[in-house]
Amino acid sequence: MFCVQCEQTIRTPAGNGCSYAQGMCGKTAETSDLQDLLIAALQGLSAWAVKAREYGIINHDVDSFAPRAFFSTLTNVNFDSPRIVGYAREAIALREALKAQCLAVEANARVDNPMADLQLVSDDLGELQRQAAEFTPNKDKAAIGENILGLRLLCLYGLKGAAAYMEHAHVLGQYDNDIYAQYHKIMAWLGTWPADMNALLECSMEIGQMNFKVMSILDAGETSKYGHPTPTQVNVKATAGKCILISGHDLKDLYNLLEQTEGTGVNVYTHGEMLPAHGYPELRKFKHLVGNYGSGWQNQQVEFARFPGPIVMTSNCIIDPTVGAYDDRIWTRSIVGWPGVRHLDGEDFSAVIAQAQQMAGFPYSEIPHLITVGFGRQTLLGAADTLIDLVSREKLRHIFLLGGCDGARGERHYFTDFATSVPDDCLILTLACGKYRFNKLEFGDIEGLPRLVDAGQCNDAYSAIILAVTLAEKLGCGVNDLPLSLVLSWFEQKAIVILLTLLSLGVKNIVTGPTAPGFLTPDLLAVLNEKFGLRSITTVEEDMKQLLSA
């Protein structure tokens, strides 16, 4: 086992990365190794997808499957070894079908890629795990060095984050052939084990630029189906009655659940990155979408144990449900998996609803505590002139984008302390689950404009980017000249690709934490600092002083 993709990876003087019987996330060595094997199979599939496009062959089954299966290897998504192997077998079957299509056009069609003809050696998980050793990401570290390995992983993990957003967009009916062609090209190239530093750096920026387009179609998918988010108050306390909790990012799953629970007497609560769903008109119209439950994903083993109803996980993040003994009432959807947990293959939630009706639910309603969400792209752009006016009248000094992933490290209290230290004449724009560090606190307003503005999920960084570009255009300056600072927390691969997106767009002087990614060496961090001004957090006092004086 070798896995260094998330923030909680093991760090030792001898090197970084989980490499024992189990990773810090709870992923076993078996599952981790089989995910490496799956990625190799997906690289071979992409190699043939690139070749097929040369012949004008576009296989939509391949295009929809490839990023979805890649998403299953993202942190805290799928811990179920047999399902990972199932994805690998499906990848090979699709590859062979695509290969046959190519051979029908040109009898001598071939692909020069080491993954292009990969076959699984056995049905036995142990033998497959041994085969997977051939594809462990650090197998040639001694030959290429830590810097090249780090750049490879930056590209691989960044592309994995983009694949997750591609799947979210695809679920909502969004498809862009250029994006999929670019995805396959990059995925296939990474399967050749590239070792050119400049080429890898260029690839990381290409992934960031591609992801900006992915976030654009994801935004289009969400807003075309569910309307543009508008500011909405959400209750974060319990309402009496039977209940279901839904977590993850998949708004379509939430919509289907709301439709199927309407009139049943079962209330629905959002958790984690589902919180922004309350801002969408076509979702909040359901009166039994009664509120948001819990805090950051890392607290789920305590909070889910206390929730008196079933739980549905639609995407990341799931962690071991046996710890809180709620594994008999947590359900996985789509690419999510945990051994022994019931999985919903389709969009029928009747079994979940039946379980909710058999459980007690909340016995009484707590005193409501309301927070505000729903500052989506359209709302943010509508406030651009107000922001400019406040800045020109010196009522608004600075905007801090304070967002990203949450996690378990104690150092993450930095982000709470930072938020509460932001001066009263400054605004906090937040997104993703890092907001749970401070989103239930009171920040007041500046002439009626809330000082805490929740822009949505991690992918809604797109809205923040569009706002920044709009403000810069209106003020006749560059984005880096705005009174705007980005202080981002990271945990997994979606955060990595958001960072690559921002860097590829030329955004500089981003501050990140709580730690640097374990796969980035001091040399690589120095390169990123020199090229983009990217740096790690220090103390709240020092960072605040520096950012306000920039």
From Swiss-Prot:
Any GO BP: response to hydrogen peroxide
Designated gene of the protein: hcp
Name of the protein in question: Hydroxylamine reductase
Residues binding [2Fe-2S] cluster: C3, C6, C18, C25
InterPro entries: HCP/CODH, Hydroxylam_reduct, Prismane-like_a/b-sand, Prismane-like_sf, Prismane_a-bundle
Catalytic activity: A + NH4(+) + H2O = hydroxylamine + AH2 + H(+)
Organismal lineage: Bacteria, Pseudomonadati, Pseudomonadota, Gammaproteobacteria, Enterobacterales
Family: Belongs to the HCP family.
Keywords: 2Fe-2S, Cytoplasm, Iron, Iron-sulfur, Metal-binding, Oxidoreductase
Modified residues (Cysteine persulfide): C405
SUPFAM superfamilies: Prismane protein-like (SSF56821)
Organism per entry: Escherichia coli (strain SMS-3-5 / SECEC)
Gene3D superfamilies (UniProt xref): 1.20.1270.20, 3.40.50.2030
